[in-house]
């Protein structure tokens, strides 16, 4: 509602808005891109996109995957990869040791989006965990994000 409101006020150009998040915010970014037309592109960093890979609960969901498979599937952006047609940049540390956000999460979402004809790019940051620390990787991440926004948002 906020995007539509500020667009109608002339404050922003809705066709040139992007969404970005890290960890749970990346999960939300992927869901927003799959289920809305509010954004031109997205950037998702170190997210959990397939909740079946976290089968013993997440956030406030305490039931296991085997107790509530429909919840896990419905909450997973991976389940909607065929609807992810807006450009999504996936960035992940290749040594992510957070049990909910192993690097496999981004690798599989990337393959699913590309396999369904979507626009996606996967960037793996060497030796980085869930949060990024190396100066070179941070600078590279910023360059990738800027390049992505220039290509899919500014150029619109």
Q: Which sequence ranges carry the predicted segments?
A:
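Active-site-proximal cap/loop segments of hydrolase catalytic domains
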Residues: 1-156
């Amino acid at each position: 509602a906020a995007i539509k409101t500020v667009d109608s006020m002339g404050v922003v150009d809705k066709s040139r808005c992007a969404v970005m998040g890290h960890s749970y915010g990346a999960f939300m970014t992927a869901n927003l891109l799959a289920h809305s037309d509010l954004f031109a592109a997205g950037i998702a960093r170190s997210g959990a996109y397939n909740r079946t890979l976290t089968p013993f609960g997440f956030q406030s969901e305490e039931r296991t995957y085997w107790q509530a498979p429909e919840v896990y599937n419905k909450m997973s952006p991976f389940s909607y990869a065929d609807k992810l047609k807006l450009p999504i940049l996936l960035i992940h540390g290749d040594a992510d040791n957070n049990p909910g956000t192993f690097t496999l999460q981004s690798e599989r979402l990337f393959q699913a989006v590309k396999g369904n004809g979507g626009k996606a790019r996967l960037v793996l940051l060497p030796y980085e965990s869930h949060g990024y620390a190396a100066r070179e990787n941070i600078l590279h991440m910023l360059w990738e994000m800027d390049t992505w926004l220039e290509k899919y948002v500014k150029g619109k």
